[in-house]
Amino acid sequence: MRLIPLATAEQVGKWAARHIVNRINAFKPTADRPFVLGLPTGGTPLTAYKALVEMHKAGQVSFKHVVTFNMDEYVGLAKEHPESYHSFMHRNFFDHVDIPAENINLLNGNAPDIDAECRQYEEKIRSYGKINLFMGGVGNDGHIAFNEPASSLASRTRIKTLTHDTRVANSRFFDGDVSQVPKYALTVGVGTLLDAEEVMILVLGNVKAQALQAAVEGNVNHMWTISCLQLHPKAVVVCDEPSTMELKVKTLKYFNELEAENIKGL
């Protein structure tokens, strides 16, 4: 696992965006061989999306031959709802870059057959071979996507019940009203995530410090979903300074020295 320790949330977003752009450009995608990118929602990736849009407008990257798969979507929330992940992605990213509509893949939380929707999503991912790079965030309790604590590390795209803590955390997007936050969501599984060629997780703020410590210094444990990254051959964790509060000094020193060349110029 790589750990990229940076000072601020803005630097985390810029580093992540630069990493994605470098990966896309090195891949040299075409219509017949697109770059497949997994994407998250929430507050954490906003600076990364902003930086990606800026780099696109500066001519540094094109998303014309990029295919995206989003991590999750609420169940029962109309896709036109301002807090649906469909709306979030278009508002913060898709509407500002040159990605073709047919290349965008989002789970349908209102599908008449939820099991079929989840199965078809997995099949579509497999039809591209694999996801080349999956970017994600992490919850205070270590969840990735909506793989809450005790999720199977072999899980696939499915419906999940959201914990009360997750709904409280997400209520900030619903005027602070927990009752407005859906109780269920469709989410890619931990196994889906681990199948990606590369996984990049962004960690921001002191509320995520325990999760980061579990990911980097703890054991692989289904109660801390983020610890699954230890099983991945190409995992990158990009974090800001407040999120490193629970790490040992020698751990942080080790990664700062290891990644010194890669964190310049931000």
From Swiss-Prot:
Allosterically activated by N-acetylglucosamine 6-phosphate (GlcNAc6P). The keyword Hydrolase applies. Pathway: Amino-sugar metabolism; N-acetylneuraminate degradation; D-fructose 6-phosphate from N-acetylneuraminate: step 5/5. Its EC number is 3.5.99.6. It is an enzyme of class 3 (hydrolase). The active site is at D72, D141, H143, E148. Keywords: Allosteric enzyme, Carbohydrate metabolism, Hydrolase. The record marks S151, R158, K160, T161, Y254 as: Part of the allosteric site. One of its GO terms (cellular component) is cytoplasm. It comes from the Bacteria. Catalyzes the reversible isomerization-deamination of glucosamine 6-phosphate (GlcN6P) to form fructose 6-phosphate (Fru6P) and ammonium ion. Belongs to the glucosamine/galactosamine-6-phosphate isomerase family. NagB subfamily. Homohexamer. This is Glucosamine-6-phosphate deaminase. The gene is nagB.
